Amino acid sequence: MLTITSIKDGIVIDHIKSGYGIKIFNYLNLKNVEYSVALIMNVFSSKLGKKDIIKIANKEIDIDFTVLGLIDPTITINIIEDEKIKEKLNLELPKKVEDVIRCKNPRCITSIEKYIPHVFYLIDKEKVEYKCKYCDEIYKVVEE
């Protein structure tokens, strides 16, 4: 049995779909930080079957929760102070995403004018589809 201790102060990213923890770990560039980080994979979960957890021993880290909600909307963020949960955030799919998804349409203005931000709006929550603000190109976050 593997035992991971609690953290005194920091952030716990919980209820990550199994296998998605490494994506979040890499997105947050946690391999190059000065503080302790634990990526725990394939943990038993009564709710998900298996899940991943990331524990970050630094509550000052700047995290874009919108992007985490795009990667996995089932995530729970726990802000820890003195080994107790101070705040709990449940993520969801963001309604608007800016400069995270890139438009693939070669005729889109964002392909020609590099300074224009890539803006997408959620159009279908079940299919996890977003639409480009400028050219209406559909982007599926989860490919079938």
Curated annotation (Swiss-Prot):
Annotated binding of Zn(2+), by residue: C103, C108, C132, C135
UniProt keyword RNA-binding, yes or no: no
Entry's cofactor comment: Binds 1 zinc ion per subunit.
GO biological process: 'de novo' pyrimidine nucleobase biosynthetic process; pyrimidine nucleotide biosynthetic process
GO MF term set: metal ion binding
Cofactors that this protein relies on: Zn(2+)
Keywords from the UniProt entry: Metal-binding, Pyrimidine biosynthesis, Zinc
Assembly notes: Contains catalytic and regulatory chains.
Family per similarity comment: Belongs to the PyrI family.
Protein's recorded name: Aspartate carbamoyltransferase regulatory chain
Classification lineage: Bacteria, Bacillati, Bacillota, Clostridia, Eubacteriales
